[in-house]
Amino acid sequence: MAMATGKATEEEQPEQGQQQQQLQQQQKQTTLQSTYRFALFFIAGCLAAFGFHALTSSSGSLLGWRLRLHHLPTAHYLQTRDEFAVYSVDELNAFKEFYDKSVSDSVGASLSEAEETNIKEAMGALRLAQEMYMTGKDDKAARLFEHALALAPKHPEVLLRYGEFLEHNQRNIVLADQYYFQALSINPSNTEALANRQRTADVVQLLDERRLSSLDEKRDALSAIHEANSALRRAKKEAYFQHIYHSVGIEGNTMTLAQTRSVLETRMAVDGKSIDEHNEILGMDLAMKYINASLVQKLYITLKDILELHRRVLGHVDPIEGGEFRRNQVYVGGHIPPGPGDLAILMQRFEHWLNSEQSNSLHPVNYAALAHYKLVHIHPFVDGNGRTSRLLMNTLLMRAGYPPVIIPKQQRSQYYHFLKLANEGDIRPFVRFIADCTEKTLDLYLWATSDLPQQIPMLIQTESDGNVLAQLQSHTSSPELYESGSGSGAGAGAGSGQKGMP
């Protein structure tokens, strides 16, 4: 028995040694795995730190990369020349072949069959339009150019040729320059568009400056009229109703002008209209009174002022959201505003810009239009962004001696079209549109206080859904080259670039 036990012990010793070796190997593997994981984490951390440093150093802030996605220009707002003008024709030709190939490859891969069909039809219409133009059939050529533009509004060749037609045949150099700009934005290597812009840029800048000087003269003429003038007081009262009527109408309110006036004067409900439509009118009334009583006299506009303005706009419609930044992502047609996490820093930058020397050095109309665009682009609220932006714009204009500008609800499509163009990189058409509305509003006041018959367009009008500005648009006092200067798409700027009654 003792010998058997000894043999068993001798056999167990090798087995125990093998188990110890296996345990040691497992421990080594575990140690290696831990070391490997640590090394991976360390490398990943270094890469993350390097990326973070690169982003913050290039943008100046943690949110710089996100701000670039929602870029709001902070310099050279109305510069008529762009970065393409600094390149020579030879430099552009140097990378033209590569650029054209990359663009055609990317566009060709993304175009649908319907879009390809539209482009083919547009190019056919474009060729026919040029033939009509060369044979002197200008009316047919104009319709064909507009048809081509409607089919392919982003095609550089269509934009270029239509711009040339507008410049040389229609003498509409402002709109032609706008199309050259769009063609260059889509295809920077388009040397013809570049050459055309280099020719038109100075002329367009001069026309814009003359237009602003004309607005200043009309503002000064209006300022010279004594406040006690009874006609001026009547015009201001009627314009007040008009301003609220059109501003809520742009957002879809169906109240007529007479109903809007009734709600404001009597505070009585109108049969067949929703509570929200009543409350939108009352909110605008509160906001306008706040502007007249407080903001117009202030030297600086703060975020608190903007929030107070918005709180009154939504005070009757949505008092919970009124005066509060949105807390969720919103989508506005094809525009995706910044996320809620970026609103604080964007609005702080907006406030800084509003009160900066740079912005205050701009012409008041340019300044007000840009403030409107910047605020509506950020879209800081769940609702009421458009109304608040228009109210802020008018606050800035009133501080400069201008009356509150009326944007007619019948021009809603143009208004949104110019905002869309601004999102695409060209703010000038929107600024010109605001200048148009400013001039028409000034003309209404001057007309009302003149010795001419007191049938005031837009201040005394029928309740039709037709053209509110029909009488104004039948008269133009603009330079020929400036006619329809802020046109939109097909139709070449209907309803814009025209001035009011003499």
From Swiss-Prot:
UniProt domain comment: The fido domain mediates the adenylyltransferase activity.
Top-level taxonomy: Eukaryota, Metazoa, Ecdysozoa, Arthropoda, Hexapoda
Reactions catalysed, as given in the entry: L-tyrosyl-[protein] + ATP = O-(5'-adenylyl)-L-tyrosyl-[protein] + diphosphate; L-threonyl-[protein] + ATP = 3-O-(5'-adenylyl)-L-threonyl-[protein] + diphosphate; 3-O-(5'-adenylyl)-L-threonyl-[protein] + H2O = L-threonyl-[protein] + AMP + H(+)
E.C. code: 2.7.7.108, 3.1.4.-
Record's function text: Protein that can both mediate the addition of adenosine 5'-monophosphate (AMP) to specific residues of target proteins (AMPylation), and the removal of the same modification from target proteins (de-AMPylation), depending on the context. The side chain of Glu-251 determines which of the two opposing activities (AMPylase or de-AMPylase) will take place. Acts as a key regulator of the unfolded protein response (UPR) by mediating AMPylation or de-AMPylation of Hsc70-3/BiP.
Parts of the chain that traverse the membrane: 38-60
Record keyword S-adenosyl-L-methionine present: no
Xref: Pfam families: Fic, TPR_14
Entry protein name: Protein adenylyltransferase Fic
Subcellular location: Membrane
Coiled coil: none
Family: Belongs to the fic family.
UniProt feature, compositional bias: Gly residues: 486-502
Stretches for region Disordered: 1-24, 478-502
Documented activity regulation: The side chain of Glu-251 determines which of the two opposing activities (AMPylase or de-AMPylase) will take place. In response to endoplasmic reticulum stress, mediates de-AMPylase activity. Adenylyltransferase activity is inhibited by the inhibitory helix present at the N-terminus: Glu-251 binds ATP and competes with ATP-binding at Arg-390, thereby preventing adenylyltransferase activity. In unstressed cells, disengagement of Glu-251 promotes adenylyltransferase activity.
